[in-house]
């Protein structure tokens, strides 16, 4: 294997491994308490997101996929 090919291969593997880590571990951010509410209906389309992660939501709200959109919602305390 050529040195340039080996470098490309190694870089690709390292990039894949770093992306496979959970976000909370990578960025040192812990998710807010609670669980996202279940949304079991099929979405014919997905709306533009209002949030991308929990820290973008005020108070105790979590960023969850709900009603065909990523939005800030009150979390469930238990899974039902």
Curated annotation (Swiss-Prot):
GO MF annotation: an example: peptidase inhibitor activity
Disulfide bond annotation, renumbered to this chain: 36-64, 43-68, 51-63, 57-72
Main localization category: secreted
Record's subcellular location: Secreted
Keyword Disulfide bond: yes
A Pfam family matched in the record: WAP
Superkingdom of the source species: Eukaryota
Alphabetically ordered keywords of this record: Antibiotic, Antimicrobial, Disulfide bond, Secreted, Signal
Segment forming the signal sequence: 1-20
Domain (WAP) ranges: 29-76
A GO biological-process term: defense response to bacterium
Gene3D superfamilies, alphabetized: Elafin-like
GO CC annotation: extracellular region
Keyword Protein biosynthesis tagged: no
SMART domains xrefs: WAP (SM00217)
Entries under InterPro entries matching the protein: Elafin-like_sf (IPR036645), WAP_dom (IPR008197)
Function, as annotated: Antibacterial protein.
Name by which UniProt lists this protein: WAP four-disulfide core domain protein 15A
Organism field: Mus musculus
